[in-house]
C-alpha cells in the first residue's frame, strides 16, 4: 500500500539533480545579505535584528572562497558533496538588498564561466520573502532575468486574520493585503502553489480556517507547516492542535483533495531504532551560511541575528578560510560528533512515537549554550500531531485501500490527556477497522 506523498509536480532541484547525477549531492549555501526586516513577526526566531548588511566586497570574497575550496577538493566543498549549489539569499528580508543579490549572482556566474566550472549550470536560487516588495521593479526584473532558476516562497500564514495575528510591520499593522498580491503572482514548478505556514501560540486557533483558505481559495496544493521550536507550548495547545488538524483532515477528505499538508505526513509516529544515530539537523557542514560580515556558520540560525547573547558559533570566515583556525575546526568537529543519542534525554530515545519529532541544533545552542543538548518544548505538540495523523490516514485508508493504514503507537495515558477517553476509544476503533487488528494486540 502506498503512503501519502508530496505531489509529483512539487519535485525540487535536489530531486532532479539526484536523478541526473546519481551519487553526487547538492550543497545549500546561504548568503545572509541583511539583518534588517520590514516586518516584526511575533514568532520569528531572528529576534536580534539590526541594520547590518553585507557589502559587495564581502560577498565577492564569499564567492571566491567557494570556488577556491572546490578547486582543492576540500572536505566541505568538493565535486561529490557540492556538485550543484542552491544559493539561498535570506535576511531579514532579502529583497531589501535586491541590488546586492543581483550583483552577487552576476559575479558568481562570471567566475563560473571564467573557470568553465560546473556551477555555471548546476545551480538554483532560493529565496523566502514576506512579499512586501513584490511590486518593486528591481525585484520584478530579477525574477524575470532568472526565471526557471529562482524558486520564490512567499510566506502566507493562512487567511487574513491568522496572517495578521503574527506577521505585522514596524507599526504593528498586519501585512496580509500587501503580501497576498505577490503570493498570487508567484507559482512553483508547473504552476503549482506552495507556501509555509508557521504554527505558533498566537495563530494556532486559526489553523484550520487558514488551511481552508489557502487550499480552497488560493489553490495551494503543497503546504509545509510546523510548530515553532521555542518555549511557550502548553498541554492546552496540544489539545487545540489535535482539534484543528482533525478539522483540516475532514476538509481535505470532504473536498476530495490531493493536498499535501506536511504536518499530516504519514512518516511520523513510529519508534526510531536504537541503531539510528543521525542528528535531525544538517548544520554540521552539510549546509554553509555566510553572515553579513563574512563569518561562516553551520547554518543561518547560528547568526547573531538569532542566537543573541551566546557567542557566535563560527566555523570560519572569508579571511582565514573555512575550518582552518583551530577554534573553528574544534567547533565543526563538535557538531559532527553530535548524535541522536548524545543530545537526547533517555525518555526521548525510549519514546514509542519519536520518529518525526524534530529539533533545531542551533536553537539547542541558543537555549542551553551547547548544540549537543536537545530542547523538547514541542513534545506534547508532536503527540497531538501523531494522533491527528492516525485519524487522517486511517480514514483515508477506508476510502482507498491503496492508502496505507496507520498504527496508533501513542500510549493510552498520553492520548487520553490530549483527546479524552471517548476520542481515544474512537481512534482505536478507527484503527481496528483500518488495520484489522484487535485492540489488545495494538495497545502499547
What are these regions (language model features)?
Residues 65-90, 374-419:
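Short Fe-S-cluster ligation motifs
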Residues 231-307, 407-411, 416, 444:
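A C-terminal junction/extension of Radical SAM enzymes
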Residues 23-61:
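Canonical Radical SAM [4Fe-4S] cluster-binding loop centered on the CxxxCxxC motif
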Residues 37, 89, 294:
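Conserved, mostly hydrophobic/aromatic
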Residues 36-46, 298-301, 345-363, 381:
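Local cysteine-cluster metal-coordination motifs and their immediate loop/turn environment
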Residues 243-271, 302-352:
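C-terminal accessory region of radical SAM enzymes
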Residues 67-90, 97-228:
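Radical SAM/AdoMet-radical enzyme domain recognition
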Residues 1-30, 75-81, 444:
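N-terminal [4Fe-4S]-dependent radical SAM core
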Amino acid at each position: 500500500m502506498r503512503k501519502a506523498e508530496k505531489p509529483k509536480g512539487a519535485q525540487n532541484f535536489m530531486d532532479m539533480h539526484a536523478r541526473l547525477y546519481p551519487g553526487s549531492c547538492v550543497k545549500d549555501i546561504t548568503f545572509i545579505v541583511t539583518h534588517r526586516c520590514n516586518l516584526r513577526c511575533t514568532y520569528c526566531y531572528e529576534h536580534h535584528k539590526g541594520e547590518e548588511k553585507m557589502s559587495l566586497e564581502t560577498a565577492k570574497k564569499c564567492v571566491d572562497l567557494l570556488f577556491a575550496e572546490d578547486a582543492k577538493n576540500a572536505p566541505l566543498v568538493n565535486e561529490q558533496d557540492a556538485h550543484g549549489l542552491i544559493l539561498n539569499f535570506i535576511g531579514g528580508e532579502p529583497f531589501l538588498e535586491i541590488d546586492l543579490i543581483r550583483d552577487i549572482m552576476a559575479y558568481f556566474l562570471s567566475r563560473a564561466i571564467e573557470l568553465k566550472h560546473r556551477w555555471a549550470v548546476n545551480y538554483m536560487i532560493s529565496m523566502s520573502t514576506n512579499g512586501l516588495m513584490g511590486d518593486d521593479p528591481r525585484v520584478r526584473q530579477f525574477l524575470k532575468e532568472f526565471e526557471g532558476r529562482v524558486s520564490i516562497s512567499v510566506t502566507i500564514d493562512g487567511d487574513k486574520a491568522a496572517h495578521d495575528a503574527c506577521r505585522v510591520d514596524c507599526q504593528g499593522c498586519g501585512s496580509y493585503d500587501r503580501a497576498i498580491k505577490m503570493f498570487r503572482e508567484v507559482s512553483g514548478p508547473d504552476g503549482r502553489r506552495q507556501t509555509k505556514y508557521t504554527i505558533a501560540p498566537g495563530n494556532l486557533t486559526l489553523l484550520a480556517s487558514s488551511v481552508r483558505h489557502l487550499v480552497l481559495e488560493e489553490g495551494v496544493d503543497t503546504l509545509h507547516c510546523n510548530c515553532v521550536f521555542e518555549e511557550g507550548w502548553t498541554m492546552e495547545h496540544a489539545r487545540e492542535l489535535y482539534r484543528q488538524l482533525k478539522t483540516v483532515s475532514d476538509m481535505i477528505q470532504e473536498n476530495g483533495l490531493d493536498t499535501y499538508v506536511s504536518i499530516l505526513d504519514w512518516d511520523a509516529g513510529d519508534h526510531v531504532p536504537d541503531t539510528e544515530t543521525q542528528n535531525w539537523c544538517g548544520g554540521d557542514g552539510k549546509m554553509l551560511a555566510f553572515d553579513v560580515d563574512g563569518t561562516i556558520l553551520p547554518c543561518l540560525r547560528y547568526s547573531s541575528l538569532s542566537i543573541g547573547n551566546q557567542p557566535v558559533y563560527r566555523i570560519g570566515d572569508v579571511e582565514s578560510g573555512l575550518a582552518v583556525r583551530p577554534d573553528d575546526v574544534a567547533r565543526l568537529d563538535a557538531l559532527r560528533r553530535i548524535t541522536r543519542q548524545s543530545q537526547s534525554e533517555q525518555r526521548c530515545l525510549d519514546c514509542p512515537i519519536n520518529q518525526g519529532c524534530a529539533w533545531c541544533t542551533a536553537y539547542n545552542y541558543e537555549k542551553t549554550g551547547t548544540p549537543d543538548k536537545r530542547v523538547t518544548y514541542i513534545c506534547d505538540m508532536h503527540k497531538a500531531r501523531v494522533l491527528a495523523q492516525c485519524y487522517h490516514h486511517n480514514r483515508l485508508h477506508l476510502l482507498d485501500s491503496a492508502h496505507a493504514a496507520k498504527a496508533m503507537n501513542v500510549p493510552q495515558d498520553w492520548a487520553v490527556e490530549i483527546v479524552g477517553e471517548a476520542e481515544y476509544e474512537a481512534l482505536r476503533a478507527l484503527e481496528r477497522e483500518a488495520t484489522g487488528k484487535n485492540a489488545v494486540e495494538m495497545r502499547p
